[in-house]
Each structure stands twice: as C-alpha cells, then as structure tokens.
UniProtKB/Swiss-Prot annotation:
Residues 23-39, 89-101, 219-248, 266-281, 384-402 have a biased composition (Low complexity). Gene3D superfamilies: 1.20.1280.110, AvrPtoB, C-terminal domain, Effector protein HopAB, BAK1-interacting domain. It is an enzyme of class 2 (transferase). Keywords: Hypersensitive response elicitation, Secreted, Transferase, Ubl conjugation, Ubl conjugation pathway, Virulence. This is Effector protein HopAB3.
Amino acid sequence: MAGINGAGPSGAYFVGHTDPEPASGGAHGSSSGASSSNSPRLPAPPDAPASQARDRREMLLRARPLSRQTREWVAQGMPPTAEAGVPIRPQESAEAAAPQARAEERHTPEADAAASHVRTEGGRTPQALAGTSPRHTGAVPHANRIVQQLVDAGADLAGINTMIDNAMRRHAIALPSRTVQSILIEHFPHLLAGELISGSELATAFRAALRREVRQQEASAPPRTAARSSVRTPERSTVPPTSTESSSGSNQRTLLGRFAGLMTPNQRRPSSASNASASQRPVDRSPPRVNQVPTGANRVVMRNHGNNEADAALQGLAQQGVDMEDLRAALERHILHRRPIPMDIAYALQGVGIAPSIDTGESLMENPLMNLSVALHRALGPRPARAQAPRPAVPVAPATVSRRPDSARATRLQVIPAREDYENNVAYGVRLLSLNPGAGVRETVAAFVNNRYERQAVVADIRAALNLSKQFNKLRTVSKADAASNKPGFKDLADHPDDATQCLFGEELSLTSSVQQVIGLAGKATDMSESYSREANKDLVFMDMKKLAQFLAGKPEHPMTRETLNAENIAKYAFRIVP
C-alpha cells in the first residue's frame, strides 16, 4: 500500500491521484475497497452507515505505514475534512488506537466509556503516556508563587537577582535578609548548599520568573518628577534594603507606622500595585535613610533590645558548640577589615537567626553582628596580654654585598611578634610600627608582605590610617562629664569596670588607656568653630579612633551614615573625650 501515507485529516491522496469510484455503502472491508492507485478513500460523510466507518477504520489500522498524524485521525473516529483541519498533536502508536476501534464495534455502555477514555488518552503527549510530565510542569506556577511571596514581603527582587547572578559566577555574595531567607528556605530546603543556583526544574523556573518580575518592575517604575507638594519631603534613598524590608505597607500608611519607620533605618516599602495607587500626590513617603541616627530615649530602647537579642544569640551559639574566641576573632575581621566569616561560624549564625554579613549600605549601629560583637566582648572581657618573646629580626645583608633594593626582605625591625588571627595587613603593620619606633612604613611592610604589588596597597592603607590618627589632637573636645550625660552616656572602664562603654568595634573604652584614642563620633558634621551640641550634632557614638582609622583605611565611609569620612573631614564629625 504505497499510497497509504497520503491519507489524513485533510482527506486527500497523493498529488495527482483521485478516486474514480463514488463512496457508497458497499463492501469496503476487503482489498477491493481501494482504488487502482491503492490510496484510501475520502472520509465518509457524517450520515454514512456505521459499518462503513468501521470497515474503513479497520482497513487503516491494519496498514503499517500509517503516519502518526493519520493514526491520530483514525483514533478520533475519522472526523469530516472541515473538522479534521484543526492542528493535531502527535499521538500514541497504532496499537493504542486499535482497542478504541474494536470498542466501538461492541456498542455497549462499558465499551463506549472505554472508547471515550482512549480518545482522551489520545490527546496526551508521549511523555504523559510514559508516565513522566513535561519539563517544568508545575514548576513554573510554583516559581511564580515564590516570586509573589517575595513581592508581598517587600523584598528587593533586583538585589536577589544580583545575588543569584554573583553566586552563579562564583563571586562573593551578601546574603539576603532573614525574611527573604525564610521564604526561600521554605521552597528550597538546601538553599545554603547552592540549591538556588542548581539545574533543578524549580530553581531554573524561579530564576526565570524572578528576572521577568525585575524587568516588569523596572519597566513600570514611574519616572521621577521635580514637582513637589508645598511640604518639603525627603528624597528616596538608594540604600539597599536590609532585614527590615519585610515590614508591611499597611504600617507605612498609618501615623504610628510611619513613626516606627523613622526609627528603623534602611526600611523600604514593598513595591505593589496597591501602594502605587494609594496616593496621587507626587510626595515621596519614604523617610531619608542617610544621615539618620536615632536620638534620645528611642536609641536607648533600640540598644537594649539589640543587647537582649545578642545575649539570646550567644546562648544559642554556645549550645551549638561554637568557640567564643574564634567567634570574636571572626567578627572583628569581618567588621573591621571586611573579611568573610568562616563557613562553619556563618552556618551557626544562620541557626540563631543572624545574617553573617553586613550590607555595604547599612548602618553599623543597627546591625545584629555589631550587637553580637559588643555582647561577646562584654561576656569574654579584654583579651589577656600574652607575653611573647620577640623574634629576632631578619639579618641585614652587609653593605659591601651588591644587591637590588627589592631582591630580599631586608629589614631593621627589632621586634616582630606573631600575628593575631583577627589582624589584617593594616592592623598588623600599625602594631609593628608602634613596637619599632623609628621604622618607616615601607620598611615595616616589607618585613611581612612578600608581593611587591600588594605591598604598595598596604603601604597606602597604613599611611591613610596613620594620617587619620594624627588628627586626634586637632579634634574639638568634650568633657568626660558632658559625655556621661549623653544618651547613652560614656562610662569609663576605670570608673565602671562592670558596665564600661563598649567601642563601636568591640573593646571597652578608658581614658587612662595608653593605646586608645577615645572619641565621640557624631552623625552630622558641624563647623570647627562650633562646640558640641546635641541638637546640631546628634548623639555621639563612642569608639577608639585607632580602630576607626583601620576601618576607614580600605573604604573611607562613615560607619553610621555611609558618607565620605577621611582625614580631611574627620574633625567635623569627631570630638575628643577629655577627663
């Protein structure tokens, strides 16, 4: 039957072949039913006898060279030409269509139900017949629900998308807030093991849905206009969101909610259609997140709340078996020198609900890691002074020996103590300079940095830290009594050994210490001719200026407002505490 493949829903034969015999109710069950061209006849009209349709169907089912489209047409009962012109999906094999044809011959209710089931099964794909669903079946709706949860929680979808891209490129990433993590872990239990960047169906569908939503948000974002209401309103901050991004939009629409928002820096309202249509006035309702430091009793309440959370987190970490000294060193390295926290400690911090990273746009004052570091120093106390025998200096080559200046680590340092775990190159270099009076910066750095190109960067950072520390004596002064009246007040370690003021970077402060430069850092700059004023400068945050210099060496940003802070303008923010 060379021409049988030409049969199908269109009811046509091979080009140029026609059936010279009219369709009739004669015997078509034998081989005489085919024309001399051996091509099947046109489908019978709807009012043709049922026996004719059965005979034609039996004939076609016995033909082996049937195409898949023809077998589907047969399984559907060979509908008329006009109905069969609808596009048809690929069907199962001819063996799956044969039971349907035999079932129609019996004309019993059970057979009719079975035939209907076969016709229903005929609309499925080969993957469905094999018992497997197509790719992403159910994964796309699931991924869309996850994205909607993030939108409802007010998450920064663009930031999450950037985090995923960085993770897939094996770059360093900043983990999202606890709210976002809880949503993602609900759907990706192995999130921390990299499930979000895996090739699973749900992860792939989620990344695609997230990118679509980010593009839609960018396309639908209204352009900023210069028109403003008569009341001056602050501009929206570009600071990325933090763990407080999950606060609901309904709180923002109430007076109490907006007041609470003022007390929570870096809070961003959720981007939803309801918020966009809430007001037609061109007023930006987000309070400014930059240069905003909580004042008065509110800041005391926030600090007490942070201390309580930090104490509870320390108990949880101790129950997990985390070494407290290792934790203190890891926190100091991360806060001061921006070095990543080790993975085992990071997982432990995740277990107690603390994100193991500090957002680059976030104030250190409200970060849980900072509260944890202060609580840890309070619990462990100052580090015991270790008596170390000074290592002998590297011998200097004789002057008569000809050598290139950088061909060896020649140094005249007399004291080179062991390096602490929490010290980076800048901190260690500054300590070596203090232990070796008269030594130069380049000479000191050459004693412990081998790479000559890295050496140049370390020298520049150390000089920046030293220049900042030299500004200490030029700062405006605040008496110890006035500092004590601050909220929270300054408490010298010599006077309050059990409740001394902690440095922003962890250590207890004392004016009698020979290695500390105690200052109060204001949140707002004022002219050098003005004395300290709580109304103008805001409340002070007390710290060691040497630690602040190390913090600013790599990235000169104000730890609270993220404005530029360096040796040129430190005197406008800092006040020296005097007895």
